[in-house]
Amino acid sequence: MAVAGAVSGEPLVHWCTQQLRKTFGLDVSEEIIQYVLSIESAEEIREYVTDLLQGNEGKKGQFIEELITKWQKNDQELISDPLQQCFKKDEILDGQKSGDHLKRGRKKGRNRQEVPAFTEPDTTAEVKTPFDLAKAQENSNSVKKKTKFVNLYTREGQDRLAVLLPGRHPCDCLGQKHKLINNCLICGRIVCEQEGSGPCLFCGTLVCTHEEQDILQRDSNKSQKLLKKLMSGVENSGKVDISTKDLLPHQELRIKSGLEKAIKHKDKLLEFDRTSIRRTQVIDDESDYFASDSNQWLSKLERETLQKREEELRELRHASRLSKKVTIDFAGRKILEEENSLAEYHSRLDETIQAIANGTLNQPLTKLDRSSEEPLGVLVNPNMYQSPPQWVDHTGAASQKKAFRSSGFGLEFNSFQHQLRIQDQEFQEGFDGGWCLSVHQPWASLLVRGIKRVEGRSWYTPHRGRLWIAATAKKPSPQEVSELQATYRLLRGKDVEFPNDYPSGCLLGCVDLIDCLSQKQFKEQFPDISQESDSPFVFICKNPQEMVVKFPIKGNPKIWKLDSKIHQGAKKGLMKQNKAV
């Protein structure tokens, strides 16, 4: 039948090949066309050719329909041909004879009679496509054994899908696909048969089955061999138990601190678990509205503190107008009403809420926090513009006692205040509060370069330490620059290197403000540089540092505070300045 079909279908095969090559530009061999024509269903032919042509629009659809029409016509001619029917009958008879030979061979095998039988050579069909290969394999398997189908959703089907690789490999099946070995007692990892018994792949702790654990507990030669076998890969894995390592002091301290925090957190969770019913109890629609103490993670002390603070603010807000204080100034003809303290409260953070957030509510107050219990005197603050202190000669004890008695405070308070005024030089160099002073050019650049050693002002400042220098927006004239350079050449010498440019409206660098002296004190203590300034008050500056990149900035009068971001960037851009002389 195959030979006759091939002979009768040769024109159709030739026609299909020519159409595919000329019309559609597909270089298709005749074997593929013969395979297409050997398909028994017209729908399968239409689907196959549609995939081959990648669509059925226009000429493609006409070619497919014409091919199916010619295929059906050719198939009818083959059926009507009596020669083909004879071929079919011969094939059926040959199949029956081969079956009878197989049955006879089995019977002879049972009776243990070895009779030589004629075996026809296997006629394997020509494999041209993957479909033919699958069909040939299916035919060969059907002769050998019966196919058994397994449901993939059953236990047996899941076992067939699971693949067990040789050796120990990480697996995340959690004992669902492979057999369970055990759980790691340190990290809790579920170890399956794929990972196998041995060191945990996460923490390195030994994990084995119950049978192996029983053998290890016997402490015999067999247990020693088993332990050596199980722990043989711990060196290669690079994971060793933490308890066996020698820790450095800072590592041990860090582990202890972490353990203490973990224990505190555990106690906190247990405490909240015990009191969860009382804390999560809802009264009416209380949870629908905001309340400061509604957070379930607050302790009893924090909750009571918040409730007390809320009552104070409510009384302050809804206080009677009769208790409001009004000041009548007859001399200035003004009526001053006391400001609402709520405005000040909303302009800053609440100390109670901030203490709860930082976890410092239960800590005792430090010495600086107890401002209401004992007076600390006047602390150094650049924002406090007070009268400058008078020069006191410490050699004369009588005058010192007289000055102490003349003051309104006691001797003990004055001595305590005097101690607060003492500032350590190392502390001044290490502390940088970001305070800045605006100076006109070209004096600002000379001050940052170290050529100008003092700065004169008409007001006193208690600030000591680092002081940033910002140039004002006013640009200097060339005449001012030349006159100032000539002056400092006379004061400092001819080998002074002056800056090439004098930028304005930017942050130049910083100096260390050592002292602020009056003109009289300045001439007494620094007679060699007294010619540089004749202002009422003189700032003594040392350690000048210039910035590599100047930041554009807008100045303010007197001493003012820099923006935090500009301050951080300025500290990173400082360079050490060489001395001018």
Curated annotation (Swiss-Prot):
Phosphorylated by NEK6. Residues 300-400 are annotated as: Mediates interaction with UFL1. The modification Phosphoserine is found at S276, S341. Keywords: Acetylation, Congenital muscular dystrophy, Cytoplasm, Cytoskeleton, Isopeptide bond, Metal-binding, Neurodegeneration, Nucleus, Phosphoprotein, Transcription, Transcription regulation, Ubl conjugation, Zinc, Zinc-finger. The keyword DNA-binding does not apply. The modification Phosphotyrosine is found at Y289. GO terms for biological process: estrogen receptor signaling pathway; positive regulation of DNA-templated transcription; regulation of DNA-templated transcription; regulation of myoblast differentiation; rescue of stalled ribosome; ribosome disassembly; ribosome-associated ubiquitin-dependent protein catabolic process. Residues 200-300 are annotated as: Mediates interaction with DDRGK1. The modification N-acetylalanine is found at A2. One of its GO terms (cellular component) is centrosome. The C4-type zinc finger mediates a competitive interaction with UFSP2 and ligand-bound nuclear receptors. It also mediates interaction with the transcriptional coactivators and the basal transcription machinery. It is linked to Spinal muscular atrophy with congenital bone fractures 1: An autosomal recessive neuromuscular disorder characterized by prenatal-onset spinal muscular atrophy, multiple congenital contractures consistent with arthrogryposis multiplex congenita, respiratory distress, and congenital bone fractures. Interacts with the thyroid hormone receptor/TR (via the ligand-binding domain); this interaction requires the presence of thyroid hormone. Interacts with the androgen receptor/AR; in an androgen, testosterone and dihydrotestosterone-dependent manner. Interacts with ESR1 (estrogen ligand-bound); competes with UFSP2. Interacts with UFSP2; competes with ligand-bound ESR1. Interacts with DDRGK1 and UFL1; the interaction with DDRGK1 is direct. Interacts with NCOA1. Interacts with EP300. Part of the ASC-1 complex, that contains TRIP4, ASCC1, ASCC2 and ASCC3. This is Activating signal cointegrator 1. It comes from Homo sapiens (Human). The gene is TRIP4.
